[in-house]
Amino acid sequence: MMGQSFFYSMPRTLCNSQGPCTILAGRVGVVFADGKEANPSTGIYIHHILTSDSTKKQKPWLSNCGNSNTPALNIAGLLGGTAFVGTGEDSAERGTVYTSEDGTRNSGYHVGAQDTFTGWAQLVNYNKEAKKIYVFYDLEWIPGIVGDDVKTATFTATCGGSPMIKLSTTGPTNTTSGKFHFLEDGNILGARGHLHGMIFSFLSVTHNRLTGFQ
């Protein structure tokens, strides 16, 4: 098993190559050179793929947990700018929607003509041989700036490491975060979780020892 983390930049290569655009929905994933989607059944595991519009700046709308005056730690925002579509293997089936599910809400993710996107992918290859894969973006969009610009946030429910996630060898356990506070009025269009902090052991096929992976 081999894991790899890499960063990439996409200057005006999504929907804004001909001018500004509005994205209604999107999904990100990885494929092989023949176009077949790479997933655990083919030996490729996505720990996460994060994307950020590095040019776009938004005022935070959600607080950090346990502190109503401090903005939430924006994980994708670590790339700079505003969070865009992302995925983890436990949340890869459905993408992100920037309007209502039926598409009637007049809103979307606004992208300027000069906006540049940055991506951060962490992948694991369970195959014995190296594999060449490609990151893909499947977007539903319309030309121009249309409707309300949605706001996004990618944050940690453990407030950046405190409280620690509770673990148990005897059965289920719960970890409760501090309270999050909304910093402005609005409507939530969607949300999904992504598990972090899981540590497991496996038998190394080359060194006959137990190895930890996070």
Predicted segments with their positions:
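Beta-strand-centric surfaces of beta-sandwich/beta-rich domains
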Residues: 1-214
